[in-house]
Every structure is written in structure tokens, then in C-alpha cells.
Amino acid sequence: MYNVRTDLAVESREIYKHRYNREIDGVVFEEKTVEEDIKVTNVDILNEEGAKAMEKPIGRYVTIDIPDYTHYDGGIMDEVSHVVAASLEELINLPEERTALVVGLGNWNVTPDAIGPKVVGKLMVTRHLKKVMPDIIDDSVRPVCAIAPGVLGITGIETGEIIKSLVEKIKPDLVVCIDALASRKLERVARTIQISNTGISPGAGVGNHRMQINEESLGIPVIALGVPTVVDAATIANDAMDLVLDEMINQADAGKEFYNILNNIDKNEKGMMIKSLLDPYVGDLMVTPKEIDDIIESVSKIIANGINIALQPNMVLEDINKFLN
């Protein structure tokens, strides 16, 4: 069977529904529009049956769809940050005095994969200040620490091993991970933010399966945030072929032999054929927008502000920005 590569729970549900023409047992879906043109979708996987169908762990997956002009509008960016913060606050059940560790996953040398390290560079980190300036930084400020551990190819160390060692040493009460994801649809690239309470597997979106970073492996809750920055080239080619076939079917005379041939093409077999044809030439090629540098810069700011607001509930964004500046 042709498996479409995606990290987004909302897309996994769409693929299943399209393939089997029914909803998934054990999965609850809720969609709402907040603020201006910002859509929030909650996908709750409740049991093993739902997890197997979705190919994702049991838990909540929040998808925030943002307008395509967000990256060029500071006001909309701040609105999205507050939506991200509100979604995070629903998943973070942590007293203010407890420590949070934020981890920016990804390779800072590869732009589509650099969103995690970029977010870390924009965070309000306070754990060290709580120790060296206790008279100035009061109990209303949460101790937050952050790290961008790089990738296995740079460090020679599994990212999960680095994080586990840090957790054992500094003993945080929560880990928040940020990583780049893969999407099934081009229109979701850099326009979707996924938040989940199930942890993350670094590199899974592009086929590099590493050690899981979740509550089971670390012993504390793990919140994962991700933004799709790449799409599988075979998926793009398959979608383009679907558009061509649909148009040819619309133009053909219904009931005629050519119409019947087009209408009976197995889309699953077509997908596998395109994948096998492309493999010798491009392998696992991933495609990203040409303006990805600007996109990563703006999306990382949105996510960093959202995390800052969620982890520091006693501060407003204006005060956080003053602190950072």
C-alpha cells in the first residue's frame, strides 16, 4: 500500500477517512475558528484501536491553521502566538514554581530543519536568574531553561540520550520539544502548527527514526510542538497526477471506454508506481518553499512567544519582549 508521509494527526485522519469512507473508532475530532482566520482542530486518540488506525500514540493533537499572510503581519503573528499559548496552557498542568526544559530539535545548518534551534534563541530563559538574582526575579517567574542539542550527524550522540541526561541532572518537571515536521499537503507547509502531549520522535518526518522523546522514556510529561516545513516530492507528483486525471475525467464522455479507463485507475497503485519511478532519480527527496528562510524566522518567533506566554502566565507579551530586549 502507498503510504503518504505526514507527521500531522489531522492529515492522518483525513487520509483514513478518504480511504475507508468512515470516521475512526476511538478518535474524537473537534474543529473551531478563533480570532481572525485562525482555525484550531483537536484530535483526541482515546484508545489502542484509534492509535493503530492513526499510526500515532494515544493523546491529544492540536492543529492550528494560520493565514498565509501571517508571516508578513506583526499583529496576526501576535494573535497566533496567543492561540498557541492558550493551546499549550490546556496541556501544561504545572504550578508556577516548577521548572520547564525547552528543547529545540533539528539541524541548525539546514534551514527547513532549523526551527527548533531558532525558537530556543528567542525564548525567555530564567532558571539561572532565579539563582543569581533571587531578590529581583520573584516567585511569579517560572524557572525555564533551554537547549538546542543538534542532531546525531553533528554531535555523534542520540538527541534522546542528551535530553535524558539533562533531565536526570537538572530535574525539570516538564519538557517542551520543538521540531520541523513533514506534511502531506503543500498548503499546510509553514501554515500549520501542531501541539501534542505525546512526545516526539526526532527526524521521523523525513524517515530518520531516532530514540523516542516522551513521558515513558524521560519519566516526566513531554509536550511537542512542530511546524511542517517539507513535503515528500512523490506526494507532490502524485497530487499533480490526480489533478490531471480528474480534469481528463471531467472532459471525457461519461460511459465511453476512455472515461471508464480513467475512472478505474487504482489511486493506490498509481501512488506506488510514481514512488518507484522517482526513487532511482531523487530517492527520498523532500521539497520546501523558496522563501523558507523568512518563514522559519517568523514562525520561530510565533512559537517562541507562544511558549513564553504559556510558561510565564503572570507576564504579558509586552513585558516578555522588554525582558528579552
UniProtKB/Swiss-Prot annotation:
Residues 1-7 form a propeptide. It catalyses: Endopeptidase action with P4 Glu or Asp, P1 preferably Glu > Asp, P1' hydrophobic and P2' Ala. Keywords: Hydrolase, Protease, Zymogen. GO terms for molecular function: metalloendopeptidase activity. GO terms for biological process: proteolysis; spore germination. Signal peptide: none annotated. Its EC number is 3.4.24.78. InterPro entries: Pept_HybD-like_dom_sf, Peptidase_A25. Autoproteolytically processed. The inactive tetrameric zymogen termed p46 autoprocesses to a smaller form termed p41, which is active only during spore germination. It comes from the Bacteria. Initiates the rapid degradation of small, acid-soluble proteins during spore germination. Belongs to the peptidase A25 family. Homotetramer. This is Germination protease. It comes from Clostridium perfringens (strain SM101 / Type A). The lineage of its organism: Bacteria, Bacillati, Bacillota, Clostridia, Eubacteriales.
